[in-house]
Amino acid sequence: ERRPEDARAKLVAESNVLREVKRWPEAHAVLVGANQRFPSDTDLLYEQAMMAEKLARTDEMERVLRQVIELKPDHHHAYNALGYSLAERNVRLPEARELIRKALEMAPGDPFITDSMGWVEFRLGNHSAALAHLQRAYASRPDTEIAAHLGEVLWAMGQREEARRIWREGRSRDADNEVLRETLTRLQVR
C-alpha cells in the first residue's frame, strides 16, 4: 500500500476479522504491528489495549491506555476502560473512581461509563451509590454486562428475587455473556 490510510485500513480490517473469530493473539499481534507503524494513532492504541486485556496482559493494557490518555486527554473510552479494569481487579479503587469520574464528565449519561461508576462504588462498599448508578445505566441501556453488575449489587443488598429477575433478563438477551456467566458461577446462582 502506497498510501498510509490504505495500509491503516487494511490493518484495521485484518484485526477486526481476527477478533470476530476470537483469534485474539493474532489480532493483538496485528495491532502491535500497526502501532509500530502509526505510533500516535489513539484508536489503534486503544484497540491494542483492549486485545491485551483479552489476553490477560493487564500491565500492557494499562501502559497503552495511559499512552492513549497522554496523546488524547479527552479520550473518555480510555479513561473508562482503565478505571473499569482497576475496579474489576479490585485494585487502586480511588484512582479507578477518579478515572471513571473524568470519563463521565466527558460523556455524561453514557450507560457503560455509568455502569463502571456503579461497579467501582460497589467495590468501594458504597452499595446504595452503586445501585443508583447501575439502575440508571440499566434503564438507559439494558445490556447483559450491566445486568450482571446490577444483579450482583442487588444480591449483595439482600434483594435476591430482583437480582434473579435482572439476571434472567440479561440471560434472555445474551445467554453466552462471559461476565454474566462468571457472576452467576461465582455467586453459585442457578
Regions found by a protein language model. Name each.
Residues 2-5, 37-38, 71, 106, ...:
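Structural marker of alpha-solenoid helical repeat scaffolds
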Residues 6-7, 16, 41, 50, 75, 84-85, 110, 119, ...:
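Residue-level recognition of tetratricopeptide repeat
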Residues 9-10, 44, 78, 113, ...:
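TPR alpha-solenoid repeat register
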Residues 20, 54-55, 88-89, 123, ...:
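Register position in tetratricopeptide repeats
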